[in-house]
Design a protein with these regions (language model features):
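N-terminal signal peptide c-region/cleavage motif recognized by signal peptidases
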Residues: 9, 14-16
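An acidic-aromatic pocket/loop used at catalytic or ligand-binding sites
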Residues: 19-142
């Protein structure tokens, strides 16, 4: 599952540019400002929906987004210090994927008033379709 989540994250970052628009399950919460260019950082402009807030508040804002997404049926399924990958079961089977990435401009001082960003993007495909790394498909026995 970890390999699937990492691959899904790479697809989000390397995917084709799409129009910048809010995602259906990702509202602009209090304290967040829509940032269409994603700060021109991390190659996310046009590939992700981004919001910004002062860096001192970005952790609390990320927590608020996790709670909001959980309330909409998204389950945290993995990630690391600055990234959360969510999955949501589809009615007909399979899972949709969504990623939230926190970042800031590391070429500038990281003071509390610096701008921090949260980037959101869907992960294409069915995240529940892939098995664990190294897992072989079951072969029917005669």
């Amino acid at each position: 599952m970890k390999l699937t989540l990492l691959a899904a994250a790479a697809v989000l970052l390397a995917g084709p540019a799409m129009a910048q628009a809010p995602l259906p399950d990702v509202p602009i919460l209090a304290g967040a400002t829509s940032t269409p260019d994603c700060g021109n950082l991390a190659g996310l402009a046009g590939k992700a929906f981004c919001v910004s807030a002062p860096l001192a508040a970005i952790g609390a804002l990320a927590d608020a987004y996790v709670a909001e997404l959980e309330g909409r049926g998204w389950l945290p399924a993995g990630g690391d210090t600055n990234r959360v990958v969510f999955v949501k079961r589809r009615e007909g089977g399979g899972c949709d994927g969504l990623q939230m990435q926190a970042f800031y401009d590391t070429s500038r001082p990281a003071g509390p008033d610096a701008t921090g960003y949260l980037g959101f993007g869907t992960i294409p495909g069915d995240l529940c379709a892939a098995g664990e790394p190294g897992e072989a498909a079951a072969t029917p026995q005669p």
